[in-house]
Amino acid sequence: MAVRAFPGGHMREILTPPIVFKCLADDTRARMTLLIAREGELCVCELTHALELSQPKISRHLAQLREAGILMDRRKGQWVYYRLHPEVPQWVDAMLKGVVDANQEWLSPDALRLAEMGERPQSPVACA
């Protein structure tokens, strides 16, 4: 098993196809990862609204994606935002963008709920 050091001394497995595909084999994790890849950055409340799932369920799935090294989070006030990890291999980034582009219809119910969400938190990445 190959590992790499992350800031703070944390060690993680290097993202291999089996790790990535195992994480994304779950419908909820696939939907949230693709929405994040599409939008750039989303907070927990936006994902809860878009996917129509409880906050604990969303947070549990986000933790798995973060621990795998696919996503990273940042806190701004009361909001926790998630985005693709900047050190995700290029092949993962390209694959996610390709899947988003090729599956707009599959993502459209979640994307529509997100677009219709009132009082979304302001994110510098989403507004850039």
Swiss-Prot record:
Origin organism of this chain?
A: Pseudomonas putida (strain ATCC 47054 / DSM 6125 / CFBP 8728 / NCIMB 11950 / KT2440)
Complex formation = Homodimer.
Protein name in UniProt: Arsenic resistance transcriptional regulator ArsR1
**UniProt keyword list:** Arsenical resistance, Cytoplasm, DNA-binding, Metal-binding, Metal-thiolate cluster, Transcription, Transcription regulation
Q: Looking at the UniProt feature table, which residue ranges are given for the DNA-binding region?
A: 44-67
SUPFAM superfamilies associated with the record: Winged helix' DNA-binding domain
GO MF, one annotated term: DNA-binding transcription factor activity
Superkingdom of source? Bacteria
Where on this chain does arsenite bind?
A: C43, C45
Gene behind this chain?
arsR1
- The membrane-spanning stretches of this chain are none
Limits of the HTH arsR-type domain: 11-103
Use case: Could be used to construct robust and highly sensitive arsenic biosensors.
**One GO CC term, this protein:** cytoplasm
Record GO biological process = response to arsenic-containing substance
Q: Does the keyword Magnesium apply?
A: no
Question: Pfam families this protein is in?
Answer: HTH_5 (PF01022)
Predominant subcellular localization, coarse grouping:
cytoplasm
